[in-house]
Each structure stands twice: as C-alpha cells, then as structure tokens.
Amino acid sequence: MADDPQEVAEHERIFKRFDANGDGKISSSELGETLKTLGSVTPEEIQRMMAEIDTDGDGFISFEEFTVFARANRGLVKDVAKIF
C-alpha cells in the first residue's frame, strides 16, 4: 500500500516538532520536553513511551519508528496534530 502523501507530511511535521535539535531522531529528553507542553508527564511515562516506540533499542526514535507508531495510533496522532 502506497503512503498517503498528506499523512506522511503530517507525520514529518509532528516529528520535527519533537526533534528539537533537528538531528533526525528524537531523544528521551526531547520527547519529555515536548510532552510537557501537552501537560504533566512523569519520567516513568517517558521511559515507557520510549520503550514502546524505540523498537531497535538505540535510545532514540527514528522517523521510521515514529511513523510505525503513528500508523498504529492514528487517533492519538490526530489529537497531537491539532495541538501542534
């Protein structure tokens, strides 16, 4: 199935919002800082999210990992997109 260009663009936009330093990957600190703008988040919640999304275990969320997560959690991503 071909990727929907509009969906890919939305994922890129959200990913870039989390990737504060623009290095092409999201660190746990970048994830935490961005999530804090959405409300209260604990270090444990950040670690759980990292563990779920960072499937290769390198300590960072790549765009590919983010896209897989976004496709599996479309409702959540739509809510985040509205805020950003």
Swiss-Prot record:
Pfam families: EF-hand_7. This is Polcalcin Ole e 3. Ca(2+) 1 binds at residues 19, 21, 23, 25, 30. Residues 6-40, 41-76 form the EF-hand domain. The keyword Metal-binding applies. Transmembrane segments: none annotated. Expressed exclusively in mature pollen. It comes from Olea europaea (Common olive). The keyword Electron transport does not apply. It is found in: Endomembrane system. InterPro entries: EF-hand-dom_pair, EF_Hand_1_Ca_BS, EF_hand_dom, EF_hand_pair_protein_CML-like. One of its GO terms (cellular component) is membrane. PROSITE patterns: EF_HAND_1 (PS00018), EF_HAND_2 (PS50222).
